[in-house]
Amino acid sequence: MISDFNVDPTAFYNIYKTRDTPENIKSLLCEGNESGEGVMQCFEIAPGIQITYNDLNMDSCFRPLRFEKNFLQINHCLEGCYECELEGGAVSFLGEGDLCVDYLSKDKQVFLGSRIPLKKYRGITVLLEMETAQKTLDNGFQQANINLEQIKDRLCSDGRSLIIKSKHEIDHIFSELYSVDERIQIPYFWIKVIELLLFLSLLDGSSVRHPQQFSADISKRTQEVYQYIIENPFMKETIPDLACMFGVAESSLKR
């Protein structure tokens, strides 16, 4: 129930303003613009560790941001897709069932922009403030021997995002997070965060890849195709037809 949350109408980027001692177990962040609105339900699991449920029905909620601390951010997409603009003008996508691991450094602007092409994105973000979260893990679950720096160095060694395509272990972890009983949410979240980090600690190269990147021109043409489909729902054109109409390769549209 929304009434159970402390409503904060400010920007979504409040999730990056971490505290050593969480003040609110749950909070609700609401934001809107001319393209739509979105809601984030945030749960502070422990110092430096947060889970956010994202329900965004808008074409963008991006604002440039310099982080005050270093974060490991893990995003899982349940529905829709999310597009990020990277340095050099390339664009990458997070699609349904994918898991994305990002290292957000206070010394570097990682993302130059973002869009929600379908104006629909539902998913979960696990956010760990590196220093504080490591202390929490060492004190609360030392037997797991989880090292966030090692996870970051192995999965995001060159500063880029990492995409892990949908697989059984990911589906198992997150399917239960989307349906957990409210009465046991916080302790259950803690268990699932540990499970997720242990899973990431064991990943090898066969399960991971860097996000597919597209040039700004291909991204723009693909968006024009999408808009054409939305405006002409009963169209008869095939993918080859659309590729020819908009001057983009069939392989790019299929991806």
For every predicted segment, state its role.
Residues 40-41, 61-65, 88-89, 110-116:
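Catalytic micro-motifs at enzyme active sites that drive phosphoryl/nucleotidyl and oxygen chemistry
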Residues 1-69:
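N-terminal low-complexity or simple alpha-helical regulatory segments
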Residues 68-90, 97-99, 129-130:
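Glycine- and acidic-residue-biased ligand/ion/polar-headgroup-sensing regions
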Residues 85, 94-215, 239-240, 244-250:
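Alpha-helical bundle regulatory/interaction domains
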Residues 53-55, 73-75, 122-129:
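Short hydrophobic beta-strand segments that form the core of ligand-binding sensory/regulatory domains
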Residues 218-226:
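Short, leucine-enriched amphipathic alpha-helices that occur as contiguous helical runs
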